[in-house]
Amino acid sequence: MIYLDHAATTPVPKAVADAMYTVLTEQYANPNAQYPFGQEMRRSVEDWRAVIAKAVGCEANQLFFTSCGTEGDNWAIRAACWQNRHVGRHIVTTAVEHHAVLNCCQQLEQEGWEVTTILPDQNGDISAESVLAAVRPDTALVSVMMVNNELGSIYPIADIAKGLKAVNEKTLLHTDAVQGFLKVPFSAKALGADFIAISGHKIGAPKGIGALYIGPRVRNPRPLLPGGGQEMGLRSGTEATAQIAGFAKAVELRWDHLEDKLHHMAEVKAYAVEKLSAIPDLHIIGDGKAPHVLSVSMAGWPSQNVVNDLGSQGICISAGSACHHGKSSQVVSALGLPKRVAAGVIRLSFGPETTFAEIDACAEALRNHHDHRMPML
């Protein structure tokens, strides 16, 4: 099998699975128990939190475990709106956000909030100036993703954070960094965002674990889940210790020689652009700078047909984010692409393990699809 869908999820290394297995079978105590077995697990949880916090660039007591990026996004948006409900009921976001953000904002619109949505340019880029121009005295929150999951576009979060200080210092800033964490270098302290959501399964950790950074400007954040008071009183529920252990181990593995891994992914992406650009009717979509995401379109050939054909050959690529119930995604729609191009968008995404030979095989399969299948659009 050739796996080129790392933006959807990633393989779990054996060392991560082993770390989880040890917790499941030997270190299974509840970390809230008061006897030594439980307190040992509490120390382990805090050690693992510190590992992840170091990679985020924050203090351990600023990082809260969640079940996924979607939970972190929703928690951040709701917490920001709660804190700033007296500032106003206006939110600024973009048309290319993950549905976790867009659908949460739609819910808030139904509750009486006003949402201003910024459109990208033809390459999928969002400028800090366009975001800041939409901020008003009553803007409670700005939510802009760090890296677009379909285009690989990197958005100027640090510039937005700096600009907000001059435009409206009360406005809080949230960024969905699920596709940015350990793929685009950043430090929470330098970035300046008030909320940063990350997810484990995009970097080799298991599904079901993520984290939310909450910065110092967030005063007395509203608890996500009332209950037993876990996660410093903000997210109750017994901690998923095995998933946390796996998350920390995955961070350690990815952090080791990270610069080399990012360089390799960037080289693989550049090689893919070169190989795929030689295929007739194939268009590179956007000019995203993230090293692991590449969207292309074989204009005239429906994306799901391409995905199915390559899948039957053991090559995993995605039309999922670029095709939603047979329609172009909000990201593709926002680019204003011709219909034939938009309907043919597919995504390839890479990991540290991706090889040039795998790109060769994918390119050959795509060329064969083009040469032997009639266009349908």
Can you say where each PLM-predicted feature lies in the sequence?
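Pyridoxal 5′-phosphate
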Residues: 1-377
